[in-house]
Swiss-Prot record:
Belongs to the ClpA/ClpB family. Torsin subfamily. The lineage of its organism: Eukaryota, Metazoa, Chordata, Craniata, Vertebrata. Keywords: ATP-binding, Endoplasmic reticulum, Glycoprotein, Nucleotide-binding, Signal. InterPro entries: AAA+_ATPase (IPR003593), ClpA/B (IPR001270), P-loop_NTPase (IPR027417), TOR1A_C (IPR049337), Torsin (IPR010448), Torsin_1/2 (IPR017378). Its main location: endoplasmic reticulum. It is found in: Endoplasmic reticulum lumen. The gene is TOR2A. This is Torsin-2A. GO terms for molecular function: ATP binding; ATP hydrolysis activity; identical protein binding.
Length: 321
C-alpha cells in the first residue's frame, strides 16, 4: 500500500526496524532530562490527526472497522491532556491486509521524525528475540528499555510486530506498564502508546467475512461485535501467541482489538493503482490486470479473497512493468 507524508501526499519507502540495545540509559541526555521534568514537554510528539485520517481514507483499502477504531481511539487519547492509561491497540488479520501499514502511518503522523524518531520503538521477534532459551535476558532487557525510554519521555510509541512469534512469557513484563496506575520516579507512563500486531484471528475474521458474503451482506455491515469475541478466543487458545500467560487480555488492558478484513479483487486493484501513483506512473490497464491475474484468491470455489492481501503488489508491479 502506498504511504503519504503529512498533508496526505505521497512519500518515500519506510525505514527498517529500529535496533534494540540492552541499556536504554545510555541514550538519555540533558534534553531528555528536561523533558522528564517539564510538565508540558511532549518531546517530538506532533500529532497530525487530519493527515492520518486523510491517508487512511485514500490508501487503506477495504478496512472500514480498522479506520474507524484507530481514528476514534487516537482522537480520544490525543485530545485528553491527562489520560487515565496508555493507549493499547492490538491489530489482527490476514497477511497483507494493512496492519503494518497502519502502524507505520501512526508513527509518521504522531511523531515529527516518524519511524526515525527516538521516541518510536519497533520490535521484531526474529530480530530482537530470536532465541527462546534467552527469555530471561530478553525480559530484563525489554523492561529496562521500556522503563528507561518512558522515563526519558512519556510520549513514546512501542510497536510489537509478529506477536504470533514472540517467545511465550516475554510480554508479561509489559503488563505493569499498560494499566492505569504505573508511575515511577515521578514520571507518568499514561501518555505512551503500545501497538501489537499479529495474524492470529485472521482465519476467524476471514470466515466471518465469507459468511457475510454468502449471506449477501455488504462487508461494511460487518460489526466489531461479531469479530472481537472470535479474535479474543483465537488469541487465548494459542499457546504460542505473545499474549499467552501474560494476563494482558485477561485483565482487559487492551483498549481496542482492531480487525483487518480479507481483501477482495477490487481492493487489490486499489492497491495496484496506489502503488503506480507512488511510483509516479500513469495507471496502465495491462499492468493492473496482469497483477490481478497473477494473484491467488481463496476459497477455491468462490475465489473471493486475496491469499496475500496487497503484500506482494509492489514486487508484482515491478515484474510486469
Amino acid at each position: 500500500m502506498a504511504a503519504a507524508t503529512r498533508g496526505c501526499r505521497p512519500w518515500g519507502s519506510l525505514l527498517g526496524l529500529l535496533g534494540l540495545v540492552s541499556a536504554a540509559a545510555a541514550a538519555w541526555d540533558l534534553a531528555s532530562l528536561r523533558c522528564t521534568l517539564g510538565a508540558f514537554c511532549e518531546c517530538d510528539f506532533r500529532p497530525d490527526l487530519p493527515g492520518l485520517e486523510c491517508d487512511l481514507a485514500q490508501h487503506l483499502a477495504g478496512q472500514h472497522l480498522a479506520k474507524a477504531l484507530v481514528v476514534k481511539a487516537l482522537k480520544a487519547f490525543v485530545r485528553d491532556p491527562a489520560p487515565t492509561k496508555p493507549l493499547v491497540l492490538s491489530l489482527h488479520g490476514w497477511t497483507g491486509t494493512g496492519k503494518s501499514y497502519v502502524s507505520s502511518l501512526l508513527a509518521h503522523y504522531l511523531f515529527q521524525g516518524g519511524l526515525r524518531s527516538p521516541r518510536v520503538h519497533h520490535f521484531s521477534p526474529v530480530l530482537h528475540f530470536p532465541h527462546p532459551s534467552h527469555i530471561e535476558r530478553y525480559k530484563k532487557d525489554l523492561k529496562s528499555w521500556v522503563q528507561g525510554n518512558l522515563t526519558a519521555c512519556g510520549r513514546s510509541l512501542f510497536l510489537f510486530d509478529e506477536m504470533d512469534k514472540m517467545p511465550p512469557g516475554l510480554m508479561e513484563v509489559l503488563r505493569p506498564f499498560l494499566g492505569s496506575s504505573w508511575v515511577v520516579y515521578g514520571t507518568n507512563y499514561r501518555k505512551a502508546i503500545f501497538i501489537f500486531i499479529s495474524n492470529t484471528g485472521g482465519k476467524q475474521i476471514n470466515q466471518v467475512a465469507l459468511e457475510a458474503w454468502r449471506s449477501r451482506r455488504d462487508r461494511e455491515e460487518i460489526l466489531l461485535q461479531e469479530l472481537e469475541p472470535v479474535i479474543s478466543r483465537a488469541v487465548l487458545d494459542n499457546p504460542h501467541h505473545g499474549f499467552s500467560n501474560s494476563g494482558i487480555m485477561e485483565e482487559r488492558l487492551l483498549d481496542a482489538v482492531v480487525p483487518f478484513l480479507p481483501l477482495q479483487r477490487h481492493h487489490v486493484r486499489h492497491c495496484v493503482l496506489n502503488e503506480l501513483a507512488q511510483l509516479g506512473l500513469e495507471p496502465r490497464d495491462e499492468v493492473v490486470q496482469a497483477v490481478l491475474d497473477s494473484t491467488t484468491f481463496f476459497p477455491e470455489d468462490e475465489q473471493l479473497f486475496s491469499s496475500n492481501g496487497c503484500k506482494t503488489v509492489a514486487s508484482r508491479i515491478a515484474f510486469f512493468l
